[in-house]
Amino acid sequence: MLSRSRCASRAFSRSLSAFQKGNCPLVRRSLPGISLCQGPGYPDSRKTVINSSNIFSVRFFRTTAVCKDDVITVKTPAFAESVTEGDVRWEKAVGDTVAEDEVVCEIETDKTSVQVPSPANGVIEALLVPDGGKVEGGTPLFTLRKTGAAPAKAKPAAAPAAAAPKAEPTVSAVPPPPAAPIPTQMPPVPSPSQPLTSKPVSAVKPTAAPPRAEAGAGVGLRSEHREKMNRMRQRIAQRLKEAQNTCAMLTTFNEIDMSNIQEMRARHKDAFLKKHNLKLGFMSAFVKASAFALQEQPVVNAVIDDATKEVVYRDYIDISVAVATPRGLVVPVIRNVETMNYADIERTISELGEKARKNELAIEDMDGGTFTISNGGVFGSLFGTPIINPPQSAILGMHAIVDRPVVIGGKVEVRPMMYVALTYDHRLIDGREAVTFLRKIKAAVEDPRVLLLDL
């Protein structure tokens, strides 16, 4: 009896183990009872029987799919205070498998684009917002069925080995026909029926070439198509029109001799790169010179509050640097420039430029700014009048460096020259202050020692 109990325990343990694995089918017999210890060593009169009504009838039951799967709803992240809504552009579709932190959609706002990643590995079950739809912060975007580890990408199947060329059946060589005997006499030449007459060359009419097919008159395409303005372009258009309608914009010009700054850059760029791992450019010189001039002329760093009719003077200097991207012009901000040196400025410009190229600029990177620098010279612009970036009161426009003849000490010399333009709000800034400000920038760029000596 004891041996039969042990046999029943072992059989039941095996059945329970097969059930727990979840991948093995459990099949119920069609008999009224199941004998666990039935065999040739045990008499049928003393069988240990478990009633079939107490055994689960389960076929291909998988516990992992039921216990581990979980559906979550992903919502729109919170926007900055100045942004209320955005447009959705989907990168994935229903049924796509995504890995954790993989971008599922992109929300384009007035100032930048916000990427929404997947919070976990899983499969997208539903898209709750249509492509191009408007969403606010906290709006449900899509549902995701979580799974285990992200499925490994299938390796490309190896190209099947080239099949060996089938051996063509050998065709028995047919003996060539016997060669004809070589003639020993020339055959007679038949005489022409009519005698040949010679004609002068002038009498021979050239054969007319076939007429060329006249090319049809070129018809230019007169089609047109429309594209919806993205949110960033709409915002740029709105802000620039507001600036034009609000500010009394006036532009003053000057020119800068770039000889000294070019010489300084050529002399120290290698040492600068070795120490700071950064390239020394011209933008850092203009940013530093602008901060120096803004401290001398604080009204250029101020702004009019139209609501209260007050002038707001900023004691800090945050300079916006215009960067062109495929989506439009963005202006990330370099903050507290008055406390920076050339290396700090170059490092910040490099980081912001890299984020702009990768479309990773956040709203915080572009908020604020007390003065803007726009460098149209990188595109070859020789002369231009930039538009103020509200809520600021002035903007500096840099242009291309061109060798031009100039008079130096009573002699004509060829120097690398750059035109610079300062557009300012004439409601707040007078002409004298604007010209003085621009001359300060000119002096600091032409002779960087001015910054060291605080002249």
Curated annotation (Swiss-Prot):
Residues 71-145 form the Lipoyl-binding domain. Pathway: Amino-acid degradation; L-lysine degradation via saccharopine pathway; glutaryl-CoA from L-lysine: step 6/6; Carbohydrate metabolism; tricarboxylic acid cycle. InterPro entries: 2-oxoA_DH_lipoyl-BS, 2-oxoacid_dehydrogenase, 2-oxoacid_DH_actylTfrase, Biotin_lipoyl, CAT-like_dom_sf, Single_hybrid_motif, SucB. Keywords: Acetylation, Acyltransferase, Lipoyl, Mitochondrion, Nucleus, Phosphoprotein, Transferase, Transit peptide, Tricarboxylic acid cycle. CDD domains: lipoyl_domain (cd06849). Residues 155-173 have a biased composition (Low complexity). The modification N6-acetyllysine is found at residues 155, 269, 274-275, 279, 309. The modification Phosphoserine is found at residue 82. One of its GO terms (biological process) is succinyl-CoA metabolic process. Pfam families: 2-oxoacid_dh (PF00198), Biotin_lipoyl (PF00364). GO terms for molecular function: acyltransferase activity; dihydrolipoyllysine-residue succinyltransferase activity. Residues 155-220 are annotated as: Disordered. It comes from the Eukaryota. It catalyses: N(6)-[(R)-dihydrolipoyl]-L-lysyl-[protein] + succinyl-CoA = N(6)-[(R)-S(8)-succinyldihydrolipoyl]-L-lysyl-[protein] + CoA. The active site is at 426, 430. Its cofactor is (R)-lipoate. Its EC number is 2.3.1.61. Residues 174-193 have a biased composition (Pro residues). Binds 1 lipoyl cofactor covalently. Belongs to the 2-oxoacid dehydrogenase family. PANTHER family: DIHYDROLIPOYLLYSINE-RESIDUE SUCCINYLTRANSFERASE COMPONENT OF 2-OXOGLUTARATE DEHYDROGENASE COMPLEX, MITOCHONDRIAL, DIHYDROLIPOYLLYSINE-RESIDUE SUCCINYLTRANSFERASE COMPONENT OF 2-OXOGLUTARATE DEHYDROGENASE COMPLEX, MITOCHONDRIAL-RELATED. Dihydrolipoamide succinyltransferase (E2) component of the 2-oxoglutarate dehydrogenase complex. The 2-oxoglutarate dehydrogenase complex catalyzes the overall conversion of 2-oxoglutarate to succinyl-CoA and CO(2). The 2-oxoglutarate dehydrogenase complex is mainly active in the mitochondrion. A fraction of the 2-oxoglutarate dehydrogenase complex also localizes in the nucleus and is required for lysine succinylation of histones: associates with KAT2A on chromatin and provides succinyl-CoA to histone succinyltransferase KAT2A. The 2-oxoglutarate dehydrogenase complex is composed of OGDH (2-oxoglutarate dehydrogenase; E1), DLST (dihydrolipoamide succinyltransferase; E2), DLD (dihydrolipoamide dehydrogenase; E3) and the assembly factor KGD4. It contains multiple copies of the three enzymatic components (E1, E2 and E3). In the nucleus, the 2-oxoglutarate dehydrogenase complex associates with KAT2A. Interacts with ABHD11; this interaction maintains the functional lipoylation of the 2-oxoglutarate dehydrogenase complex. This is Dihydrolipoyllysine-residue succinyltransferase component of 2-oxoglutarate dehydrogenase complex, mitochondrial. The lineage of its organism: Eukaryota, Metazoa, Chordata, Craniata, Vertebrata. The gene is DLST.
